[in-house]
Amino acid sequence: MTDRIELTTANEFIARHIGPRAADEQAMLQTLGFDSIEALSESVIPESIKGTSVLNLPAGQSEADALASIKAIASKNQLFKTYIGQGYYNTHTPAPILRNLLENPAWYTAYTPYQPEISQGRLESLLNFQTLISDLTGLPIANASLLDEATAAAEAMTFCKRLSKNKGSQQFFASSHCHPQTLDVLRTRAEPLGITVVVADEAELGDVSDYFGALLQYPASNGDVFDYRELVERFHAANALVAVAADLLALTLLTPPGEFGADVAIGSAQRFGVPLGFGGPHAAYFSTRDAFKRDMPGRLVGVSVDRHGKQALRLAMQTREQHIRREKATSNICTAQVLLANIASMYAVYHGPRGLTQIAKRVHQLTAILAEGLSTLGLKAEQAFFFDSLTLNTGSRTAALHAAARARHINLREIDDQHLGLSLDETTSQSAVETLWEIFASDGQNLPDFTALAASVPSRLPATLLRQSAILSHPVFNRYHSETELMRYLRKLADKDLALDRTMIPLGSCTMKLNAASEMIPVTWAEFGNLHPFAPAEQSTGYQQLTDELEAMLCAATGYDAISLQPNAGSQGEYAGLLAIRAYHQSRGDEHRDICLIPSSAHGTNPATANMAGMRVVVTACDARGNVDIEDLRAKTVQHRDQLAAIMITYPSTHGVFEEGIREICGIVHDNGGQVYIDGANMNAMVGLCAPGKFGGDVSHLNLHKTFCIPHGGGGPGVGPIGVKSHLAPFMPGHARMERKEGAVCAAPFGSASILPITWMYIRMMGGEGLKRASQLAILNANYISRRLEEHYPVLYTGTNGLVAHECILDLRPIKDSSGISVDDVAKRLIDFGFHAPTMSFPVAGTLMIEPTESESREELDRFCDAMIKIREEIRAVENGTLDKDDNPLKNAPHTAAEIVGQWSHPYSREQAVYPVDSLIENKYWPPVGRVDNVFGDRNLVCACPSIESYQEA
């Protein structure tokens, strides 16, 4: 009998996404004592929430069919030549950066560099980014990116509030020349904090003594280049701080903010090689004075040394961050925009100071030629000085001119019914300028002579604001200008790191799963990448279809009634969700409801976000099994009944189990007038099995960069949409270009829109059946690891059935007591085995939290378990005295190649150090540095590129 031939390709992608083969799956189930994956699911999911998920989704499509489907959607977007500007510009992504970085899984599948020894490549690139920002802004300390320019402005506002000596003030000045989307996000952030944002023309500003800070745009949104020096002095005299939103390309030619007194500079690095992407993702920047460094938001790369004294990089001053300081953190930011910051960094490396300056001069000269030509046509720019943007008083011709431009497939900025705006960029050419003259010319007018104007038009930058200081003098910006050199530099950096292209990354709570190539392909299509977020709606019908379909898919997966795709990180999704709850209570006259209950096990973003949303945090206890202590919750809910706003709870719990009492918890909160926020960080265990919107949740955020396959990018981008029940739908984030105008949490209507195709592709190829199997296999893989390792390390928490959800926590505290070996020692020793460490000391100090995801094969799971078992044997050798308690492979891990070929004085062999298991002989990862000295790095903070001599020593 011949085998039956399968004539359909539906659902074929499921087996590509899921790691274990059928035989492996059965063997793993038998290890756990189950005969089917359904039986395991039935045992793990609590009875009270079974049947809450009904995935009403079509069958999965093949990769080829899904790509054809999304290509048809993308083709509905119309790509006009765009001069809208307003913080978003066309740009050329250099091909070697596109191919070797953006499309390279060695870069886009990496995790945030909390483990510095295996992250030196992207840390170096981020240090280059920080140096770029510091140089261009004239301020000594810059962070490693924020989410977008508007949210960076909001961070600057709260930064000024913390540091201003004008402590009694609740007023923040924002220039009316700032980008409109920035002003909207400022208002959203300010309201829960009791801050009043005063928007006015700085030229009409009188007394400034009532302000704690100010935000100025440089150049202004309308194109003007203002001299802010006197204004900055006035604010400083009133004990206020000044933030400047500055265009990076313009800063190659203009006096940097730090040199005219600004305390903070913020902005976007988008025009440094990152496509428009219908609004994102793009890396924002934040730089400030050295005295303020410990109050900066976001991550900061610093220079330190390893245990051998060799230069090494690391994330510095982490005590500022939400995962440590919780509600007292400087910000709730977790995910940033590392991948996009690295693109901008390499754009600067590739072009160098001369190349960037030449681009800026070309853009400015073309703008000056355009303005002069328009002047001869009777349209004089309103700006005396400008860099790349013009405002034209077009009067009664405005509508006709706009229509004429549209007819030529050109978008102009519609300022009002009397004015049009134009912003040029590095893609603008002579022919583009001449086409604009044709549009603006009246019938019978002779067009200007481009060549003649090019020879005679002077600069329109103010002489008093021309940049005098040098930029990008460090060798890294002056070496890699040929494609060959840049390609090899990118390869050298990538080889220093561990990402998913080399190994499993078993980080608990982080869901480091497959980012399939077919999901990634549409991201770099021009139809998705080259659309301005403020283009007319009829030009973005493809995006509208994509977002409508994706919202419906996510509603089906979560059980919620409505979805907002605007938040561009999980932390921002949390914020949007709590703002929706806050607005809901206010709409009912319950403004006094401001208590947010948060379990003690919660991720640090939860209390930090509640604080940002104007809520007071009350912590509830957890019991010995890691579950929410329901009696403590009940008591505190009753105690705060009249002020209760919400509870924030993660499900499955942060401890890696499905809590049996989740419905009861939701009921207690609802009965006392509160709303239930279910943190969707662990949604990877629930899709197709149970739905938060059906078992008591009122709102959840989802991490598309976890459950739904958007890559982590080394620390961003992420997308954190929120799902809500119908009563909260009117309070989801709005935008000036949407039906609801208020409540924007980021600059663009759909946030990081250009990476939404990744999630659409994943869901479309998996279908309902595949999504359910992904959850089931994630649970199977976690329980398999738990079972294999429980004889060697105590599994700290399990459900009532002795099973975990999609992750498990190993308790290393007894090992620390018996041997002196710490969780850090085990994490660093795993590097010698070629693994990224699991999550360390969260949610319990002295533990490792392991999440394998469904994408890892049994072979890889066994390789990890074998490594952990081998490490336990080494620990036993320390315990029984066979290995020295201080000089052993764990305390000295990780071991570098340089160390192995150098003088060897350890009481264990070189072979034991670097080849503890035979499989490493054919495939060995060599860390570029030894264990990094964290204390040295914070005590001797250096956050810009060190000298070339130190690179040579490295």
Swiss-Prot record:
In-chain residues carrying the UniProt-annotated modification N6-(pyridoxal phosphate)lysine: 706
Database matches in CDD domains: GDC-P
Named cofactor requirement(s): pyridoxal 5'-phosphate
InterPro entries: GcvP (IPR003437), GDC-P_C (IPR049316), GDC-P_N (IPR049315), GDC_P (IPR020581), PyrdxlP-dep_Trfase (IPR015424), PyrdxlP-dep_Trfase_major (IPR015421), PyrdxlP-dep_Trfase_small (IPR015422)
First-tier enzyme category under EC: oxidoreductase
Enzyme Commission numbers on file: 1.4.4.2
Subunit field text: The glycine cleavage system is composed of four proteins: P, T, L and H.
Family designation: Belongs to the GcvP family.
Function: The glycine cleavage system catalyzes the degradation of glycine. The P protein binds the alpha-amino group of glycine through its pyridoxal phosphate cofactor; CO(2) is released and the remaining methylamine moiety is then transferred to the lipoamide cofactor of the H protein.
NCBIfam families: gcvP, PRK04366.1
The protein's name in its UniProt record: Glycine dehydrogenase (decarboxylating)
Organism, scientific name: Pseudomonas savastanoi pv. phaseolicola (strain 1448A / Race 6)
Lineage, opening ranks: Bacteria, Pseudomonadati, Pseudomonadota, Gammaproteobacteria, Pseudomonadales
